[in-house]
């Protein structure tokens, strides 16, 4: 199994069990999340409650909770929303921190295409939920979630060049 870590913090952000599609000249990965129910346990112990005088559905309240699979699996932490000015400030710092960690070929491609990816993200800024990895580091890479038109499940966007592939 492959895990993708934040190159700046080492936080696990994604794995190969979630399929991605490259967009914006390979700058961003688009990943479909899913709402799932966590904690709902339906245990059949083989008893017949009606024959034993028991009521329907007696027992423990198992506190089922709906969560988004990617957020839950990688313990992503939601961040306050950014306005355009805050996002541009973040991007300047992010580019400054990430560029030295890339090899020469990656740096060239990153510098060539990051402006287009930034404009794409800015065009959707009001629709995003913002997440970072578990450590919530100041220099952490952002993960963006939004709902496509009519979608019931969120779509996540990752900065491809900020992910480091690790075999588990």
Curated annotation (Swiss-Prot):
Domain of life of the organism encoding this protein: Eukaryota
SUPFAM superfamilies, alphabetized: Mss4-like
GO CC annotations, alphabetized: cytoplasm
TCTP domain location: 1-168
GO MF annotations, alphabetized: calcium ion binding
Cellular localisation: Cytoplasm
Key word Kinase present: no
Keyword entries, A-Z: Calcium, Cytoplasm
Entry's transmembrane regions: none
Keyword Repeat: no
Family membership: Belongs to the TCTP family.
Record function comment: Involved in calcium binding and microtubule stabilization.
Descriptive protein name: Translationally-controlled tumor protein homolog
Protein's organism: Glycine max (Soybean)
């Amino acid at each position: 199994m492959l895990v993708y870590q934040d190159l700046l913090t080492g936080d696990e952000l994604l794995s190969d069990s979630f399929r991605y599609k490259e967009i914006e000249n390979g700058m961003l990965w688009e990943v479909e999340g899913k709402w799932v129910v966590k904690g709902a346990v339906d245990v059949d112990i083989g008893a017949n409650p009606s024959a034993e005088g028991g009521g329907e559905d007696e027992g423990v309240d198992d506190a089922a909770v709906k969560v988004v699979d990617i957020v839950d699996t990688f313990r992503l932490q939601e961040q306050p929303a950014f306005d355009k000015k805050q996002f541009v400030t973040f991007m300047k710092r992010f580019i400054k921190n990430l560029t030295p960690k890339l090899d020469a070929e990656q740096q060239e491609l990153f510098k060539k295409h990051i402006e287009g990816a930034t404009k794409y993200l800015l065009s959707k800024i009001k629709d995003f939920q913002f997440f970072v990895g578990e450590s919530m580091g100041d220099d952490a890479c952002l993960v963006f979630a939004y709902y496509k038109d009519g979608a019931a499940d969120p779509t996540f966007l990752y900065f491809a060049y900020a992910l480091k592939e690790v075999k588990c």
